[in-house]
Amino acid sequence: MCKAKVLAIIVTYNPEIIRLTECINSLAPQVERVILVDNGSNNSHLIKNIIINNLEIILLSENKGIAFAQNHGVKKGLEAKEFDYLFFSDQDTCFPSDVIEKLKSTFTKNNKKGKNVACASPFFKDHRSNYMHPSVCLNIFTSTKVICSEVDDDLYPSHVIASGMLMSREAWRVVGPFCEKLFIDWVDTEWCWRALANNMIIVQTPSVIISHELGYGQKIFAGRSVTIHNSFRNY
């Protein structure tokens, strides 16, 4: 059986170059191709100087939003018609060396159970506070949050964040691209909900827990943990 090939998409906007390079280096050995789409960064002249064998850099002239950049990268990459999976990353997450294999295994395991998997995702832990971001399942009446441990079984949330998401090419064909009317927030959530509407499932596996930073950390407000984002994202 031929090895399933993975196309990784990284979207950047004014990234820290050292951290971005670490992110790319953590992914490049695990996938067949990395496409970086920059959304009109002030330091794009530094981004284009990053040289890694299987990396292609696309510099956009302006910031058209994360959905546009992700879709642009996927469209460019799928011209080759050789990839089975798409992997999405932000600009500052460094991934463990086995993240792709573990997420592909999650796909295989669940598909063998007769589940129609759209995407598989890891869990994230904020290393500053040791806060484990929960798996979230929404319905009309309630919101259920589950904190995982490494020994737990896979969970099936209503949505996951795009960074760290491994998506099948078939899911991309069936569900369609990300909604470009949404600039930053809700892009990944809206796509996941469309996947569910197409009778596909979202899988979150505790076999992969990634250390990262989301916004400026967590604050307790009215008894709930709230993520504090930077002013650019808010306004």
Which residue stretches match the model-derived regions?
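Short, well-formed alpha-helical segments that are part of the catalytic scaffolds
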Residues: 10-29
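A conserved acidic beta->alpha catalytic loop
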Residues: 38-47, 62, 93
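Glycine-rich, basic loop-to-helix element that forms the pyrophosphate-binding segment
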Residues: 61-78
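Short beta-strand-to-loop acidic/aromatic patch adjacent to the donor-nucleotide binding site
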Residues: 83-94
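Conserved donor NDP-sugar-binding/catalytic core segment of glycosyltransferases
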Residues: 98-134
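Short, flexible, basic/aromatic active-site loop/helix in glycosyltransferases
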Residues: 137-158
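A short, conserved alpha-helix in the catalytic core of glycosyltransferases
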Residues: 165, 171, 175-176, 181-208
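Active-site-adjacent helix/loop segment of glycosyltransferases
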Residues: 201-235
